[in-house]
Structures are given as C-alpha cells and as structure tokens.
Amino acid sequence: YGDTSGYSYDLGPNGYNAAFATGGYPYTSPVGYFAPNGYGLYDMAGNVWEWCWDRYDAYPNSVGSPYEGGTDPRGPTSNLFIEHVTRGDWWSDSANHARCAYRNSLNPDLANYSIGFRCVRML
C-alpha cells in the first residue's frame, strides 16, 4: 500500500473508497460509509474539501517561492484573508483531485456545502 500513483491511499480494489462523483454515493456521505483504506483510515478523500491550517503558496522548494529553501508556509500571516490549503476533494468532483498529492486553495471567507474540516491532534 503505497505507490507513486498518488491514489494508493484511498482507491481500493473496487476503486470506490472515496466519496466522489463516480464513487456510488450521490451527495455527502455519512462518516465511515465507505470501507477503510489499506492503513485502516476512513474518509480520507472525497465527501468535502477539508480546510488545512497551511496558507496556500508555491511549494516551499519551488523556484521563486517566498519560502524557497525549505520553510513551510504554515498558519495565518498578518493578513487573515490569505487563501488556505484545502485537500481531499468533494463528492461532486471527479477522482482526479481525490488523491493525497493534490491541494486546492480557498479564501477563508468562503463557506458552503462542499467544504468541511477534520479535527486532528499531534501525538
């Protein structure tokens, strides 16, 4: 479980371990509706975009990035309206964005049925 396709963490043998347009559920699905992935984790892709604390910017090692050299652009800056990263895709989209390597950006003022969040804790 783990390859270079970018999809290995949620697409099981039947390809439908994520809630997206071709995943067999016509709208947001209940928590745990789909089988867990190979790591035993549920609902890691699809259903709703999930807000991340990281602000959106070029990847840290991208040429021309203000964070070139490896500094991760985490958390808000003095401008709280800067776009933040969202990940995971949402139920009405295709599987192209339902992969761990894809990230999206949205303004924190935006709120609708396609956006959610996941509570996490550092161990």
PLM features: residue spans?
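Surface-exposed recognition segments
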Residues: T4-S5, Y9, P13-S29, M44-L123
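Short, small/polar residue-rich loop motifs at catalytic or cofactor-binding pockets
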Residues: F34-N37
